[in-house]
């Protein structure tokens, strides 16, 4: 598996269930490379926009690789 699709509906289901006001997204890259793909950035933007509509702030999206990570917030992708 080299890709996985996630929808805003899936992301925010638990957040809304517990009346959360913010979330942090986190996923791994089995390849070990923590660099965000174009799809990672596009999906993050979509989820951030959905969060604004729902009133749930997306604080960060962190990608885990081999002994490293990338914060999309730190890299200013969001």
Say what each PLM segment does:
Residues 1-78:
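Active-site-proximal loop/helix of nucleotide/amide-processing enzymes and allied scaffolds
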